[in-house]
Structures are given as C-alpha cells and as structure tokens.
C-alpha cells in the first residue's frame, strides 16, 4: 500500500485559494478519492489500489500538480510505501 502526505503553507493557501481556505482540503480529499485514495488523518491519504503499485501515486501527483492553488501553496509532499497500517484508535478510546 502507498500513501501520500502533504503540508500546505496557510499564508500561500489564503492568497491562492481564498477564504474559506480550509475548503481546499475538502477539494483535495474529493479529487484524491476519485482516483482511489482514502483519507486517513490530517493530510495523509492511502491508496486503495489492490495492485499496490506506484502508478496510482503518479496519478495523484499529476492531478495535484495541475491544481494551480495547490502547487503554489504546497510546502512539502511525500509518497511512501506503508508496510503495515495498524489502527489503535479503539484501544486508546476504551482504555
């Protein structure tokens, strides 16, 4: 499984996206879901592609590169392979 994580500069996002700037995150989520990514937390998205290859990551990077406000606002963007994805939420909430 592959993931994408990014960080946006809020001052640049306000300048290039406008207000309410937080809608930009919903827009990214919607676009990435269309190509097989699932939002997990913050600005981290996991690929749901069963083929488990970098082609889906490439599609996502290409898609985000074509969003004008995104490319002007992104501070950092990374893609990485996830070997294991363990959800400890229930343990923490019921402790």
From Swiss-Prot:
One MF annotation (Gene Ontology) recorded for this entry: RNA binding
InterPro entries (alphabetical): VapD, Virulence_VapD/CRISPR_Cas2
Keywords in alphabetical order: Hydrolase, Nuclease, Plasmid, Virulence
Coiled-coil residue windows: none
Gene3D superfamilies for this protein: 3.30.70.240
Keyword Nuclease: yes
Domain of life: Bacteria
EC nos: 3.1.-.-
Keyword Nuclease: yes
UniProt subunit comment: Homodimer.
Similarity remark: Belongs to the VapD ribonuclease family.
Role description: Cleaves ssRNA, mostly between U:A.
Protein name: Endoribonuclease VapD homolog
Source species of the chain: Aggregatibacter actinomycetemcomitans (Actinobacillus actinomycetemcomitans)
């Amino acid at each position: 499984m592959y993931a994408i994580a990014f960080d946006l500069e809020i001052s640049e996002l306000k300048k290039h996206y406008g207000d309410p700037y937080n809608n930009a995150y919903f827009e990214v989520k919607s676009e990435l879901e269309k190509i097989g990514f699932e939002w997990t937390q913050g600005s981290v998205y996991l690929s749901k592609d069963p083929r488990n290859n970098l082609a889906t990551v490439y599609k996502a990077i290409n898609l985000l590169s074509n969003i004008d406000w995104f490319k002007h606002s992104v501070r950092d963007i990374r893609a990485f392979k996830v070997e294991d994805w363990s959800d400890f939420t229930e343990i923490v909430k019921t402790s």
